[in-house]
């Protein structure tokens, strides 16, 4: 899945640059500029649909990649793993600020709700939120800085990816048995390149199908309404890939408690290398750990479902 993530990143950066060329980061023009892109720019509709659904595939790939890392004990490459977790956090931040840019109803209210969570931090919270907003509510300054961040962060991700790969190449990659695989080394080309082409095709076909046939399947219909600070949508919820975390946030009645649980649900990944006690690296021959692992997967799926 690492290769697929790299391809996702390249696709997102290319489509994103093309979109940025036509986008206007201003509250009065953002929504109209996105509509203009889809109507009047050559293949603008396709570029936008690929960019919006490409994000979903990026998250599908990264969740599968993390799941596989957990299953096969890849987290014992501590540096690689920790940079991977930082990559996940950066990706989540990028997706969040990007979601705000079209300036639809859910963009605006999502930004309001999530940035407002920082006010739960004791003592400095309120100041922090007003500093992030650039005022007393989500408004033009917020949109402008979110666009700046959304442009910058993917290049940070690309840089971190190189560091991630550098550390991975220190140890070499893991295998399903979790044992040294020096004796099994084979040339990258044609073997791995062929295997990667299969994964590439299996990702590209659903992505293009989704972008061409039902581009709005995963989006929120509220985003077809321009942002209105005076009308709150009936259900404020993020894109599907954040629903598990959002469900955790919403299920805790205390604001600070919810924020801490939300943060912990992702940051727990940093602790995984410290929690490994087994003599075997991988879960291949550990049925008990397998049960726990698949319970975790089911748990995340249920949270995602409940969150929606």
UniProtKB/Swiss-Prot annotation:
<feature type="binding site" description="axial binding residue">
    <location>
        <position position="51"/>
    </location>
    <ligand>
        <name>heme b b562</name>
    </ligand>
</feature>
<keyword id="KW-0349">Heme</keyword>
<feature type="transmembrane region" description="Helical">
    <location>
        <begin position="81"/>
        <end position="101"/>
    </location>
</feature>
<dbReference type="InterPro" id="IPR036150">
    <property type="entry name" value="Cyt_b/b6_C_sf"/>
</dbReference>
<dbReference type="GO" id="GO:0046872">
    <property type="term" value="F:metal ion binding"/>
</dbReference>
<keyword id="KW-0249">Electron transport</keyword>
<dbReference type="InterPro" id="IPR027387">
    <property type="entry name" value="Cytb/b6-like_sf"/>
</dbReference>
<dbReference type="InterPro" id="IPR005797">
    <property type="entry name" value="Cyt_b/b6_N"/>
</dbReference>
<dbReference type="GO" id="GO:0006122">
    <property type="term" value="P:mitochondrial electron transport, ubiquinol to cytochrome c"/>
</dbReference>
<comment type="similarity">
    <text>Belongs to the cytochrome b family.</text>
</comment>
<feature type="binding site" description="axial binding residue">
    <location>
        <position position="150"/>
    </location>
    <ligand>
        <name>heme b b562</name>
    </ligand>
</feature>
<feature type="transmembrane region" description="Helical">
    <location>
        <begin position="194"/>
        <end position="214"/>
    </location>
</feature>
<keyword id="KW-0472">Membrane</keyword>
<feature type="transmembrane region" description="Helical">
    <location>
        <begin position="45"/>
        <end position="66"/>
    </location>
</feature>
<feature type="transmembrane region" description="Helical">
    <location>
        <begin position="1"/>
        <end position="21"/>
    </location>
</feature>
<keyword id="KW-1133">Transmembrane helix</keyword>
<dbReference type="Pfam" id="PF00033">
    <property type="entry name" value="Cytochrome_B"/>
</dbReference>
<keyword id="KW-0496">Mitochondrion</keyword>
<dbReference type="InterPro" id="IPR005798">
    <property type="entry name" value="Cyt_b/b6_C"/>
</dbReference>
<keyword id="KW-0999">Mitochondrion inner membrane</keyword>
<feature type="transmembrane region" description="Helical">
    <location>
        <begin position="256"/>
        <end position="276"/>
    </location>
</feature>
<feature type="transmembrane region" description="Helical">
    <location>
        <begin position="146"/>
        <end position="166"/>
    </location>
</feature>
<comment type="function">
    <text>Component of the ubiquinol-cytochrome c reductase complex (complex III or cytochrome b-c1 complex) that is part of the mitochondrial respiratory chain. The b-c1 complex mediates electron transfer from ubiquinol to cytochrome c. Contributes to the generation of a proton gradient across the mitochondrial membrane that is then used for ATP synthesis.</text>
</comment>
<keyword id="KW-0408">Iron</keyword>
<dbReference type="Pfam" id="PF00032">
    <property type="entry name" value="Cytochrom_B_C"/>
</dbReference>
<keyword id="KW-0812">Transmembrane</keyword>
<dbReference type="InterPro" id="IPR048259">
    <property type="entry name" value="Cytochrome_b_N_euk/bac"/>
</dbReference>
<comment type="subunit">
    <text>The cytochrome bc1 complex contains 11 subunits: 3 respiratory subunits (MT-CYB, CYC1 and UQCRFS1), 2 core proteins (UQCRC1 and UQCRC2) and 6 low-molecular weight proteins (UQCRH/QCR6, UQCRB/QCR7, UQCRQ/QCR8, UQCR10/QCR9, UQCR11/QCR10 and a cleavage product of UQCRFS1). This cytochrome bc1 complex then forms a dimer.</text>
</comment>
<feature type="binding site" description="axial binding residue">
    <location>
        <position position="164"/>
    </location>
    <ligand>
        <name>heme b b566</name>
    </ligand>
</feature>
<dbReference type="InterPro" id="IPR016174">
    <property type="entry name" value="Di-haem_cyt_TM"/>
</dbReference>
<keyword id="KW-0479">Metal-binding</keyword>
<keyword id="KW-0679">Respiratory chain</keyword>
<feature type="transmembrane region" description="Helical">
    <location>
        <begin position="288"/>
        <end position="308"/>
    </location>
</feature>
<keyword id="KW-0830">Ubiquinone</keyword>
<protein>
    <recommendedName>
        <fullName>Cytochrome b</fullName>
    </recommendedName>
</protein>
<keyword id="KW-0813">Transport</keyword>
<feature type="binding site" description="axial binding residue">
    <location>
        <position position="65"/>
    </location>
    <ligand>
        <name>heme b b566</name>
    </ligand>
</feature>
<dbReference type="GO" id="GO:0005743">
    <property type="term" value="C:mitochondrial inner membrane"/>
</dbReference>
<dbReference type="InterPro" id="IPR048260">
    <property type="entry name" value="Cytochrome_b_C_euk/bac"/>
</dbReference>
<feature type="binding site">
    <location>
        <position position="169"/>
    </location>
    <ligand>
        <name>a ubiquinone</name>
    </ligand>
</feature>
<dbReference type="GO" id="GO:0008121">
    <property type="term" value="F:ubiquinol-cytochrome-c reductase activity"/>
</dbReference>
